[in-house]
Every structure is written in structure tokens, then in C-alpha cells.
């Protein structure tokens, strides 16, 4: 059974945990505070019995962490309240509250109010209730705040912002499976953060808000994970002109996903996105220099022409027998591509594939192969498949500037000598296919 540290328990000295030769107290106070900041506040408070010097030292610790499961029933709120009132540090750098009891959650609003009055810089609130009821976040404390820089909210929290918030210094906002009261609350929160740079959103339902609008001019990093498979209801509207990093994962069966172009975009990762009625995802990524795509080919719209003029690095994780089509589309659309990575792109047995699944040789060699591609990596290369062998051969033959190619295959046991021999024969044959115009370093690996 888990041993829990309870406030008001047996003293450390009485349990023989205090050495008569107290060397740790000789450390500089700044170092002691740094050490104590990494511990749960319940443990930090327990150190007050060590000596006269330690009696008030915990009150200066800038980072406080409380977990309701380490408190006796009905004592959590009182203990947190007393700790916040007794806190003497000039600034409260961070406060972590983890609440697992419905009764303790009732006083969260009061505790948050005290913390905000202490000029808090980082606040993490995690509420997990068995009844799956939601605790309303006190919006009044967000009406005018110029010290909070990081806000992280998790699970059973209801966000209701009837008017525009004013979080002038907020730079990072993390929302994990929280609920909004309405679409207006989303806009009032995000539009009231003029310094917001990093936004992370995890959702598994569109029942609270159908149109999730993210319009933040200052936003530089955006991550959205939505594992809800919808029925063509709801979606996202994203307008972030300063965006440099975009990560979208799990947009399945949404009604729409509309993204304004981000001219400063550097890197984007798009995974498990398909069957969206109205979307422009790929068209919004044309400024990216680095792309990672994990998609079922052509389940979303692909614009035509050489549109990825800035793209230098492409990682492709397709999971359909049609993935060749996506590969050639991206190569043909990215004339300056220098790095190509293929990762486990084939997960379907040949007998399950429809007619016409075989790879067909492109009519024209993509420009990036002729003039720019320098690095080619293929992870979990299926050397026994003729189609994959044909693709690898084509790239090696036509990539005139290729400097290094790495192909990794699944391991083969030493008892399968015949299979090992066939793989060695195939790899040796492949090694002869590299374009004679380059000095490519061809590497074969086994995972």
C-alpha cells in the first residue's frame, strides 16, 4: 500500500531521521530553497521541525505543490489556505494543485484567488473527479492580471468567460480535456492574452464547443490533439499569422478545419487527419521548411503545382497501400527538398490491397531529386516487397546530389540463414543502383 505523507504526522526527529551532525543546514539559503522547491509542499513543511533555522525556511520556497491524496479528508483546503497565507516569498513562482475529491474541489476558487494575489507566475490545476462533474474556474481573477506567465488546466474544469479576460503576461497556455461553456468563452480567453506564444489543446469531444476559434496574432507554437471521431459536426478556425510551429493530431470526421496561411511557419506535423468536409490544411503549410506527415493518402485536399518552395525536410509516415501517390506528390511539389525520411510507410499485406496498388514510375524525375536531395532515410524498409525495392532504386538512381542514404530493416534471426542470404543479396544489388554522378554513402542497418 502506498505510504502517504500526512501533515501533522510524526516528526522527522522522533523517527530518527535527523543526524546529530547537521551538515545540510550549513548550505547557503538560496541552495536550500532550490532543493526544497523540487519537493511536494507537504514534505517541505515537515522540515520545519528540523531546527530553528528550518522552522520558517519553508515559507520562503517560491514553488508550492499540493496533492489532495496526501491529506486527510476535509483537511486539504485548510492546509493549502494556511500555507498560502503564511507564504513570505516576494513572488510565488509556481503553484501546483492536484485535486481528486469533490469536497476539496469546492474551495478551489478561494485558493486560486489567494494565489493570484501573491503575484503568481505559473499555475497548474489538475482536477480529476470520479463523478466526471466539472468545477467552474473563477473567471474574475483573469479580468486583470499582469504577472501570470504560464497557465495549465487539466480535466474536470469548466471555463466560462462571459467577457474578455486580461492576462497581459501569459505566454504559455495548456488546456487538457477541459470544457468551455460556449464558443464566446473560447474567444474571450484567447483574445485576452496579447503575449500568448505557446498554446496546447487536448480534446476528445466537440459537444461543448462546435466552432473552436483560435485567433491570436502573437501565437508562435500551436499543438492540437483531438481524438474524437466525429460525424461531420464542428471543427476549428485558426488565424495565427506569427505561427512558427504547428502540430495537429487526430482530426477525424470534423465538419471543417480552416487555417489562415502562416508566412513565418517553420515546422509542421500533421497526423491522423482525414474525412473533413471543409478544410485547407495542406494549403496552409506552404511556408514550412520542415514537414512531418502521417496521413492516409488523399483523405484530405492536396493543392496542385510546386507549392512547397521553402520545404527542406520531409518525414512521411503514410499508412495505406496508396502511399506512393502521396510520396510522389510531395516530391514533385517540393523542388528544394534536401532531406527525405520514410518511416514504416506500409502496414497492409499485399493480398488486402485493391487492384492497381502497384507503384508506377513517374513520367518526369522530380526537381528535388535532380538538384537538391542530399539525405535519404528509410526506416523499417520492407526489402522483400518489389514495390518498395523499385521506389528505393528509383530514388538512388535519380538523386544526383545524394550524400548519404540509410535503410534500416527488421531484424532476422541467425537461424534463418536463407533469409539472411537473400537480404544480403538484395542490399548488395541495391548498392549498385546509386547514381554514378554522386559519392553517396549507403548505409544498411538492422533495428
Swiss-Prot record:
Stretches assigned to the FBD domain? 358-409
Q: Which domain of life is it from?
A: Eukaryota
Q: Start and end of every F-box domain?
A: 21-84
What is the source species?
Arabidopsis thaliana (Mouse-ear cress)
One Pfam match, given by its short name, reads F-box
Gene Ontology CC entries for this record:
nucleus
Source species taxonomy: Eukaryota, Viridiplantae, Streptophyta, Embryophyta, Tracheophyta
- What's the name of the protein? FBD-associated F-box protein At3g49020
